[in-house]
């Protein structure tokens, strides 16, 4: 479980993810959003999963964090369609989860840095970029999308 904060803008962060993560992180993010929604009393989305994971706790911490994550999940779905010319089946669940969103993603709190200490800096975006370049570059491919500058 993780969210890769490769940019402060949830759309750009989705566009910067490699093919493997565009596919995988849609489901993981929907699971975190579903867990947060269920913790707030909503019976929607997937069953709760990893409720005590630092990133799931962050998503549930404020409506603004939830808003960032839901927009990011939607943008990952858009990225999936751009790269593979298909619609990810989780997109419907993400739309349902969006219905309870009442936050402003610009007011989100700093997310946890779920990565080895060697990649961490004071800036969470730089930390996630360090982690991505240092640990994910070996398998990173970008179908129908240019490689982000920090990965070159």
Q: Predicted regions: what is each one?
A:
Residues 1-52, 56-152:
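Sequence termini and other peripheral, non-core segments
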């Amino acid at each position: 479980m993780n969210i890769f904060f490769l940019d402060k803008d949830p759309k750009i962060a989705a566009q910067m993810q490699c093919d493997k993560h565009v596919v995988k992180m849609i489901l993981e993010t929907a699971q975190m959003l579903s867990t947060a929604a269920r913790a707030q009393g909503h019976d929607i989305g997937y069953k709760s999963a990893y409720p005590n994971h630092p990133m799931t706790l962050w998503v549930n911490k404020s409506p603004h964090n939830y808003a960032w994550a839901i927009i990011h999940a939607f943008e990952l779905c858009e990225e999936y369609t751009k790269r593979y010319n298909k619609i990810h089946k989780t997109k419907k669940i993400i739309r349902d989860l969006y219905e309870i969103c009442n936050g402003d993603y610009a007011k989100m709190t700093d997310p946890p840095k779920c990565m080895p200490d060697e990649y961490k800096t004071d800036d969470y975006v730089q930390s996630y970029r360090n982690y991505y370049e240092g640990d994910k570059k070996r398998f990173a491919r970008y179908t129908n999308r240019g490689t982000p500058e920090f990965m070159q």
